[in-house]
Amino acid sequence: MTRALRLLLVSGALSLGVQQAHAQTADTAHGPVPDSTMLTTAMVDAGRKIFHGRGTCSGCHGDKLQGGPVAPALTGRSWRHIDGSYSAIIDRVDNGLAGTLMVPHPGGIEESQVFLVASYVYAVSHGMAKP
């Protein structure tokens, strides 16, 4: 077997492996859910700004994520409709919750901002950041 053919076979096998790994981790229609261990201070800070700004999240969940008459608190480990995992928070911000005021992409936030808001909520609810 020639060297070129071996390289072609190896690169094809690697490409297939990457595609399969991606397919196994793709938890949303938009690609793989980032791992919560990869959260950075910059992501959390950006998410905080969106949560309290354009996302309008604090209008229902409160300035300190303490909840209110129409939305639950997001500060503890007790969750009303989800398990509090990073992927579940992403899904909720991305898809909303039918029959409630929680709409998909609150405040018209963009897809990339969904992950940032989820980073902030996850970090606060897991004691990694302050509201």
Predicted ranges, named:
Residues 41, 48, 62-94:
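Gly/Gly-Pro-rich "capping" loops immediately C-terminal to redox-active cysteine motifs
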Residues 25-52, 131:
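Electrostatic cytochrome c docking/interface patches
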Residues 17, 56, 126-127:
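A generic secondary-structure boundary signal that marks alpha-helix termini
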Residues 53-59, 73, 101:
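Residue-level recognition of specific faces of alpha-helices
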Residues 1-33, 37:
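N-terminal export/targeting leaders of redox proteins
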